[in-house]
């Protein structure tokens, strides 16, 4: 039997999410839209008109999108007819369910574009691509489904996913990891693995059979470093904008001497570096058909022509105007969407840049009264830190 058919059979027998997690979207946590806005370098709030959920299972993620974006049309597809039948039943009571259309479709087939319809501003594929025999074909389909400025949210297994370590151990106990068969013996071995691995945050021995059958067991499971997933994406014509998990690790580089050493790496390049040093178990990535802005970090005079633009990821109260431009002020940045608080010691000239970072004026225009007294190296390093944190984007000089 072909691998694809075997995988379909898993979800026909045990549709996912399991009954315990089917809250018509209530239990599904989406990526913060403010973070997506920030790394997508948007100057206005993101409001997708059409959303595609690829590999929707019984519809929990689709209902969550319908609740978050009340004006959006949501199309959700899955290759399991049984899962789609359950999703349509849940749709009757789900908030925003009338704006969700469910279809049986294979995301590896070019027919996906025809079934899904008009292009989408947002495509989400969460926890699916790791179990697909030909991920490149799927990614090319997603490119065909996206509008030119659309984004893809991709959730895939990382190099430290439990399956990497656990599947070889299962075989040592005589358990076939290619197919899940519920038994007391299997649960006992999983409890042993839980214990020997230091009791993970979420016990696999206690997980629902539907999760175990498709995520830990099964005929195929790609658990790759971010760099390898990114290679698949680049070949399909997609540009990595950022990794949600790597975003948190960057906060440890607030010491200016440390973060300056990363220049001129983009957010995506830093994300790959973080994953090399701290391999993720699961990647939540944002990609786009449109390449990110290339900021000239190594060319200070060109950088001065860029236009700083604040994102909506942080809130902060700026100190008052006046005083020496090199006077250091304490600035606290708070982000409820990503549960982050950052405290910076910023000179007055940096405060003024933030005060006027509306995308209308270049750095040179903002600093014109005092530019000779602002060290260019300090300016570049300050802007790079704010960029990596997602506080600002630097728009091109050309409008």
Where would I find each of the regions flagged by the language model?
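A short SAM/SAH-binding and catalytic strip from SAM-dependent methyltransferases
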Residues: 121-135
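Conserved alpha-helix/loop element of class I SAM-dependent methyltransferases that forms part
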Residues: 13, 23-48, 64
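Substrate-binding/catalytic lobe of Class I Rossmann-like enzymes that use SAM or dcSAM, i.e.
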Residues: 179-256
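Conserved class I S-adenosyl-L-methionine
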Residues: 153-199
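A short glycine-rich, Lys/Arg-flanked "PGG" loop and its adjoining helix->strand segment in the class I
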Residues: 136-148
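Long, charge-rich, low-complexity alpha-helical segments
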Residues: 81, 251-289, 339-399
């Amino acid at each position: 039997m072909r691998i694809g058919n075997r995988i379909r059979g898993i979800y026909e027998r045990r549709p996912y999410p399991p009954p315990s997690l089917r809250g018509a979207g209530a239990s599904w946590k989406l990526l913060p839209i403010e973070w997506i806005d920030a790394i997508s370098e948007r100057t206005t709030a993101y409001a997708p008109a059409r959303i595609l959920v690829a590999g929707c299972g019984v519809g929990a993620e689709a209902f969550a999108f319908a609740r978050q974006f009340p004006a959006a049309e949501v199309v959700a597809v899955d290759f399991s007819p049984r899962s789609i039948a359950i999703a349509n039943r849940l749709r009757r009571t789900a908030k925003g369910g009338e704006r969700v259309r469910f279809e049986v479709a294979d995301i590896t087939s070019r027919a996906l574009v025809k079934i899904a319809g008009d292009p989408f501003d947002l495509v989400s594929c969460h926890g699916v691509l790791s179990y697909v025999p030909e991920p490149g074909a799927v990614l090319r389909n997603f490119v065909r489904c996206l509008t030119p400025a659309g984004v893809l949210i991709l959730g895939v297994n990382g190099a430290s996913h439990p399956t990497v370590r656990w599947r070889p151990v299962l075989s040592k106990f005589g358990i076939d990891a290619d197919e899940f068969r519920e038994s007391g013996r299997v649960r006992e071995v999983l409890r042993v693995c839980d214990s020997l691995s230091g009791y993970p945050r979420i016990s696999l021995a206690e997980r629902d059979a539907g999760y175990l059958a498709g995520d830990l067991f099964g005929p195929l499971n790609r658990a790759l470093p971010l760099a390898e997933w990114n290679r698949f994406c680049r070949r399909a014509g997609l540009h990595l904008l950022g990794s949600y998990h790597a975003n948190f690790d960057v906060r440890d580089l607030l010491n200016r001497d440390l973060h300056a050493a990363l220049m001129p790496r983009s957010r995506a390049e830093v994300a790959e570096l973080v994953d090399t040093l701290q391999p993720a178990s699961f990647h939540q990535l944002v990609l786009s058909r449109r390449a990110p802005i290339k900021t000239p970090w190594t060319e200070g005079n060109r950088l001065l022509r860029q236009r700083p633009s604040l994102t909506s990821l942080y809130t902060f109260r700026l100190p008052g105007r006046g005083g020496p431009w090199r006077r250091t002020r304490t600035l606290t940045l708070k982000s409820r969407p990503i549960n982050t608080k950052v405290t910076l010691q910023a000179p007055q000239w940096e405060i003024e840049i933030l005060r006027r970072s509306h995308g209308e004026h270049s750095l040179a225009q903002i600093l014109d009264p005092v530019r000779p007294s602002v060290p260019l190296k300090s300016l570049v390093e300050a802007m790079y830190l704010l960029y990596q944190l997602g506080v600002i984007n630097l728009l091109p000089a050309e409008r």
